[in-house]
């Protein structure tokens, strides 16, 4: 079952989060969006967006057990010589000559890397860091894409000739989220600032996570008794600033949104809870017995 | 005679009416209206619920379960609060093959949780569709971090699935009683 969709309704960050949390292995391809002239209805039954179908592939990411291992984008030269040049490890002339030679000898990236290390042009660390930088820059670019169709193929592997550098997605998600913050999008993601936050159940999710000063300030106030609005006030942040930080923490799986234990001050548009009908156990058991026996032909 | 009620909610065209039709012992009392032929909605389906759907399951002479389906279109959301009043629990239907409706599904879920903190389950509908997302992916997409919340595969036209979804909701209600 392929995971298909459109970045207009399921963003790159959300996709990376899904792949990270479910520890997927496979390839994610982003396609050019080809207009169909038709509209697509969103779940509210009134908002319409352009319906696009997949055209030519524009970018591809590969994952292994939830880690990003490879990225290529049509608009970014992914040859190892170019990657090393962009990260300042080779000059333009060196890059051009090495590329020419590698192409003449039909060398793979792996073979070329070995030759460059043996010739003391670069170190293994230089190569890994340069590829990481290239990969991450592709992901950050993808995070700004807003409407392209995508497809995730389970088990699909990266080209064998390429150098795979595993990258933890959580820090990318946090950094990428900082880059792509847009007020409107954030309001859609976190419509209700009267919700509270609590830390994720699994404390191991905090390992290797780097937080900024503002994020630490917010983290200090995380408690199911404090609404997001109250945290923003305590930290002297605007709604957008707090949304930015909470969104990043949510996407990285560090916190969860919960109803506040002590009711936060209501916004005027929040409706009052309706009375609850408390059933007794006998009623529920009788319902279960009845429903188990229903065998109606549709 | 005691009556109890459950609410079937979810985004536009997620399969709420079909779900109730599949298990109700009576012909569903529906308030469906035709969608304008040229509209985008009409590409999805020809009719939409404007007030509610109503189904019934008679347990015995003393007990009846009513199933209320909410209108999917936001412009009829004034009905939601009315329908939520006194519910035992609710089912959030999601069309697993339409990621464009996931955000709305999450918003509806949060709204109903705000109306009443009753147990609920999420039905990952249209699992027979080629493009359907798996329930475990939907859990992440809908940000349902609480593993106690059941996210169940569903095909709203198939009685087996519908029965299972309602049973799981009832089990959740029992579990909540136990925990209290």
Where are these regions (language model features)?
Chain B
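Conserved catalytic network of the ASCE P-loop NTPase/AAA+ motor domain
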Residues: 49, 58-61, 81-86, 112-116, ...
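Inter-motif core of Ras-like GTPase G domains
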Residues: 75-98, 111-115
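Conserved G1/Walker A P-loop phosphate-binding module
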Residues: 1-46, 55-58, 64-66
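Switch II (G3) loop of P-loop NTPases
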Residues: 59-77
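Loop/turn-to-beta-strand initiation segments
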Residues: 62-65, 88-89, 118-121
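A structural signal for isolated positions on well-ordered beta-strands in alpha/beta enzyme cores
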Residues: 7, 121-122, 150-152
């Amino acid at each position: 079952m392929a995971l298909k969709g459109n970045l207009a309704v399921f963003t790159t960050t959300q996709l990376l989060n899904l792949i990270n949390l479910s520890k997927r292995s496979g390839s994610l391809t982003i396609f050019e969006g080809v207009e169909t002239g038709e509209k697509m209805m969103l779940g509210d039954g009134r908002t319409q967006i352009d319906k696009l179908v997949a055209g030519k592939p524009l970018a591809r990411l590969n994952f292994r057990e939830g880690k990003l291992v490879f990225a290529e984008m049509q608009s970014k030269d992914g040859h190892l010589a170019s990657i090393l040049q962009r990260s300042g490890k080779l000059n333009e002339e060196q890059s051009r000559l090495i590329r020419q030679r590698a192409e003449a000898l039909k060398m793979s990236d792996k073979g070329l890397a070995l030759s460059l290390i043996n010739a003391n042009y670069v170190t293994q660390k230089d190569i890994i860091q340069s590829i990481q930088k290239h990969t991450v820059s592709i992901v950050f670019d993808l995070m700004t894409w807003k409407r392209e169709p995508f497809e995730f193929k389970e088990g699909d592997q990266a080209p064998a000739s390429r150098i795979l550098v595993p990258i933890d997605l959580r820090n990318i998600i946090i950094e990428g989220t900082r880059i792509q913050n847009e007020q409107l999008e954030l309001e859609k993601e976190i419509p209700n600032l009267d919700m509270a936050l609590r830390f994720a159940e699994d404390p191991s999710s905090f390992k290797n996570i780097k937080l900024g000063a503002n994020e630490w300030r917010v983290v200090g106030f995380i408690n199911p008794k404090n609404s997001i609005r109250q945290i923003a006030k305590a930290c002297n942040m605007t709604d957008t600033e707090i949304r930015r930080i909470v969104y990043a923490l949510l996407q990285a799986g560090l916190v969860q949104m919960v109803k506040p234990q002590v009711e936060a001050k209501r916004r005027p548009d929040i409706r009052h809870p309706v009375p609850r009908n408390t059933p007794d156990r006998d009623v529920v058991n009788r319902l279960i017995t009845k429903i188990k026996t229903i065998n109606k032909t549709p | 005679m005691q009556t109890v009620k459950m609410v079937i909610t979810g985004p536009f065209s997620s399969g709420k009416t079909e779900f109730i039709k599949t298990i109700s012992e009576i012909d569903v009392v529906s308030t469906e209206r035709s969608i304008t032929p040229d509209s985008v909605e009409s590409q999805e389906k020809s009719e939409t619920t404007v007030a509610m759907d109503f189904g019934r399951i008679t347990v015995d002479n003393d007990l009846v379960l009513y199933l209320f389906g909410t209108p999917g279109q936001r412009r009829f959301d004034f009905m939601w609060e009315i329908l939520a009043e006194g519910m035992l629990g609710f089912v959030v239907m999601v069309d697993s093959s339409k990621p464009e409706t996931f955000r709305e599904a999450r918003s509806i879920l949060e709204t109903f949780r705000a109306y009443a903190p009753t147990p609920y389950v999420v039905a990952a509908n249209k699992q027979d569709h080629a493009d359907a997302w798996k329930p475990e992916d939907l859990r992440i997409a809908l940000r349902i971090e609480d593993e106690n919340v059941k996210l169940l595969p569903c095909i709203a036209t198939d009685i087996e699935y519908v029965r299972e979804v309602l049973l799981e909701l009832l089990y959740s209600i029992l579990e909540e009683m136990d925990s209290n």
